[in-house]
A protein has these predicted regions:
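Extended, low-charge hydrophobic alpha-helical regions
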Residues: 1-150
Length: 150
């Protein structure tokens, strides 16, 4: 059908763009692992009393936000994200994560679970921009929420 053909075209186009991006700036461990690793780099900053209180708080907030993609991917696979995240963080090996497709722990790069560096950086940069805008705004207009009653 036309819809399936358009969807297939979009997937191929996305793949081509991802490869181009990877060729430009390289790749990082996928599955949220690269962002999870960066969240760990912020822990010393958030605990260091030499930094102002606001700086430490911002580091904690950003670290928590960087953990979210990894946790969401694991949760979407129907797995306890806290348990998996603890195991990955305890291992402390660069690129080590959990492959939800094979349900195995290991090196994400070797398993082919990758993200283009440029895409990861752009997503993070855009998220920080949106968060900064929200935090510096007095009011925000969003879509109305609908609540379902049980």
């Amino acid at each position: 059908t036309d819809l399936k053909q358009k969807e297939r075209y979009d997937r191929v186009d996305d793949a081509v763009c991802a490869v181009r991006s990877a060729l430009l700036e390289g790749i990082v461990a996928g599955g949220g692992v690269a962002l999870l690793e960066q969240s760990q780099r912020l822990s010393p900053v958030s605990l260091n009393d030499n930094h102002p209180k606001e700086y430490r708080l911002a580091a904690r907030v950003l670290a928590t936000a960087l953990e979210a993609p990894f946790q969401q991917i694991i949760t979407n696979a129907g797995i306890d994200s806290e348990r998996v995240m603890d195991k990955v963080m305890d291992k402390g090996v660069k690129g080590y994560g959990f492959n939800v497709k094979t349900r195995e722990y290991g090196n994400m790069l070797r398993q082919g679970v990758i993200d283009p560096t440029k895409v990861t950086k752009s997503a993070l940069r855009n998220a920080v921009t949106v968060a900064t805008t929200i935090l510096s705004t007095n009011a925000i207009i969003t879509s109305a929420r609908t609540y379902e009653s049980n």
